[in-house]
Structures are given as C-alpha cells and as structure tokens.
C-alpha cells in the first residue's frame, strides 16, 4: 500500500471511530486532488483511494464532494485506458463506473474550494456541488497534491495558503457549518 493511502485509511477509520461516540446527524467528505497532468497520476490515485474508503465506511455520494482534475484515466499515456490504479498489481480499479465527480478539470480552483467550504456559491449551483452541512455535521477534508511549508498548489496555476484555509474553517465555524472537522 502507498504510505499516503495508509495515512488516509487510518484518518478515515479514526474519523468514524470518533463519530460513534458523539451526537451527529451527518458525515461529509470533501476530497480534493489539486494536481493535473500525467506525471501527477499518484495524486489522483490517492484521492480516489480515499473516496473508496469513505464510501465503504458509509458516507453516500450525496455527502461526498469530489474535486478531480480528471485527466489521468483517459490520458493517451495510460496503458489501461479508463482506469486508475494505486499500485502496480492493478488489484482494484479506483476509477471504475461508480464515481461521482462534482468538480472536474478547470473547476478545481482555490476560489471554488473556498466558496464550497464557506457556502458562498450562487443559487444556480446544483445540490451536488454544495456542502449542505449544519452545526451537527462532521466534515473530513482531504487534499492531495504538491505544496510546501504552509501552502498547497492547485493545478500549477495558483496556491492556497494555510491562513486561507484557517480563515475558511473559521468562517465555517461562525456559520455553524460543522461540529467537528478532520
């Protein structure tokens, strides 16, 4: 298993173990792959592995926001078209037929991510692209990509800083959009 996948699995199990003892009405996951291009295949595999994990632990697609650059499965360099695997033995196709991508390609931006978290999206935005949480919701936010000390790159075009993320979480707290976040 990939070290990142192990970490993701441990994080997801910890999340749901903690939820078993608390009052809650809804569990949500926001899963973000921030890297494009073939040489970042591993980042798409990471976020899809986390997607499968949270689904297996009981979060329905209606409560998972999946943000993917979505260009690896159909990339001409992919020797197994339409598939994404996390290891060389190809034991499990992570892409499969049952994934629901909410934000894809150039929709995966810092602005859209912050708007999603803080509920600053227009009324025309479909429910599938909204984080419909409240003060009793638990939220897992998982992001994978390239970054450095206090920042993460989005598609090699822009960056989100630690302070931007902290500010978004503070706004979410003030708007009573979660009870706990992971």
List the model feature ranges, each with a label.
Residues 135-153:
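Active-site microenvironments of hydrolase-like enzyme catalytic domains
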Residues 124, 148-182:
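Cysteine protease catalytic core and zymogen-processing segment of caspase-like enzymes
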Residues 2-136:
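Boundary/activation segment at the start of structured domains
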Residues 28, 138-140, 181:
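Structural motif
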């Amino acid at each position: 298993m990939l070290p990142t996948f192990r970490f993701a699995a441990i994080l997801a199990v910890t999340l749901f173990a903690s939820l078993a003892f608390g009052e809650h009405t809804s569990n949500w996951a926001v899963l973000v792959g921030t890297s494009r291009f073939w040489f970042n295949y591993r980042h798409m595999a990471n976020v899809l592995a986390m997607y499968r994990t949270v689904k297996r632990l009981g979060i329905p697609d209606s409560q998972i926001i999946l943000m993917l650059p979505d260009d690896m499965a159909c990339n001409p360099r992919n020797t197994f078209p339409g598939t994404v695997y996390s290891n060389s033995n190809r034991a499990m196709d992570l892409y499969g037929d049952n994934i629901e991508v909410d934000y894809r390609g150039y929709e995966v931006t810092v602005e859209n991510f912050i708007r999603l978290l803080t509920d600053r999206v227009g009324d025309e935005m479909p429910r599938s692209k909204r984080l419909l949480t409240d003060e009793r919701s638990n939220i897992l936010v998982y992001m994978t990509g390239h970054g450095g000390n206090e920042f993460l790159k989005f598609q090699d075009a822009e960056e989100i800083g630690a302070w931007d993320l902290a500010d978004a979480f503070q706004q979410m707290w003030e708007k009573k959009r979660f009870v706990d976040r992971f």
